[in-house]
């Protein structure tokens, strides 16, 4: 549990848990407390391929507030949602698929509002940036459904005090929203 292969997004929760999307190993590594040494093995892994109808899952994005967890299954065109922090064998509460989601990558959330950066989106958000877009769910999904809105660019972002701070893929543009985008 210490050999990563093409790690994607990482998140450190306020209570010290560390989650790493270990893309080429089709899993999310979980340390239940912050590692104290380099190369320290994870406490366990969440095997994301178990929860999608595709050969690989290739998790790229991961988000958590210490309770809820979101993981992208990029190759499977799916997003996995847990309402409570999962153990190694806990299935997600929601496996979200949508014809609008292509290859989901980055995740931003405040525990209710969810933004999903997508390099190969389909549907209404295809525009000046080609297929790069960010899907928006204005409330935590409780079932598989299409996004509520979209932003015509793939953003890596953060939410603070109900404001969005984002950088477009490639780093050429910054986005600031004084309110959550709907």
For each of these PLM feature ranges, what is it?
Residues 27-31, 105:
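Mobile, glycine-rich extracellular loop/lid and propeptide segments
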Residues 17-19, 68-71, 113-117, 165-166, ...:
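Conserved beta-propeller blade signature
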Residues 26-28, 77-79, 122-125, 134, ...:
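Structural signal for beta-propeller blades
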Residues 23-24, 33, 74-75, 84, ...:
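Short loop/turn segments immediately following the C-termini of beta-strands
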Residues 1-13, 54-66, 100-109, 158-169:
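Signature of short aromatic-glycine-proline-rich micro-motifs recurring in repeat-based ectodomains
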Residues 1-2, 40-54, 93-100, 144-160:
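Surface-exposed loop and turn segments in beta-propeller and other repeat-based domains
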Residues 14-15, 25, 66-67, 76, ...:
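Residue-level signal for tight coil/turn positions that link beta-strands
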Residues 31-39, 82-89, 136-146, 179-182:
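Short loop/turn segments immediately following beta-strands, especially the blade-tip
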